[in-house]
Amino acid sequence: RSTETLEEYLSYAKVKQDELKDVGGFVGGTFAGDIRKAAYVEGRDLLMLDLDNIPAGKTEDILKRVAGLGCNAAVYSTRKHSSYAPRLRVIVPLDRTASADEYEPAVRKLASLIGIEFCDPTTFDVARLMYWPSCCKNSEYVCEVYDRPFCSLQGLLGMYGDWTDIVQWPRVPGAEAIEKRRLAKQENPTEKKGIIGAFCRTYSITQAMEKFQDYMNLQIWKEDIPIQVEQR
């Protein structure tokens, strides 16, 4: 537990909140070269879900749903959890390592069995890191462990007609609308501040390509041929 109250924590800027809840974390898988990016995932042994959209007073309902899965699982509350705004993390060990391709359809199917509408839309990322649990000094901390057989990866994937068909994957309701709003808020390049904005207001893409084509060719030539180029 930390020294600030939940009310104080919620009043902090996001940067400070992130600093306080960063008590280390885990992925539950392996990466080539220890590079935590989707392209480097070698396998995942844990399915992990952030349930950030649980209705007030429904913590026990979620715990019952997880218990009803009948497989090994752990549930703990995340930093902002409260009885009026529950936030829980669900961890489910697999009976075999999931490949990078298998992970997302498997974790989405698991989410649908619990209630995918409660999930953070970004929680299905194969390279996502989860923080170890922490809480404020007056927070309600939830931690439940269900000591049962590991979840069958093939059992989850077998619930699909074809698990490689992304059209069949369960989705968080409204996730597409959220993404569209996020993209709509992206800053217009010509309205950016500083040198980037000034450059974009001066040159269109085609104008920039024409203006700097000779320089681009020189740079490519210098990178492809390992010799010293004398600048005149």
Across the structure, where does each feature detected by a protein language model lie?
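Short, glycine/charge-rich beta-strand/loop segments that flank catalytic centers
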Residues: 28-32, 78-80, 125-129
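Modules that initiate DNA replication and primer synthesis
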Residues: 38-68, 79-116, 131, 136-138, ...
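DNA replication initiation on ssDNA origins
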Residues: 1-46, 56-60
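Short secondary-structure junctions and interdomain/linker hinges
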Residues: 20-23, 27, 73, 117, ...
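A short linear hydrophobic-aromatic micro-motif
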Residues: 71-77
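Short coil/turn linker and secondary-structure boundary residues
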Residues: 4, 15, 54-57, 98, ...
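Basic/polar, cationic surfaces and motifs that engage anionic cell-wall
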Residues: 119-180
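Intrinsically disordered, low-complexity segments enriched in small/polar residues
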Residues: 22-27, 31, 37, 153-159, ...
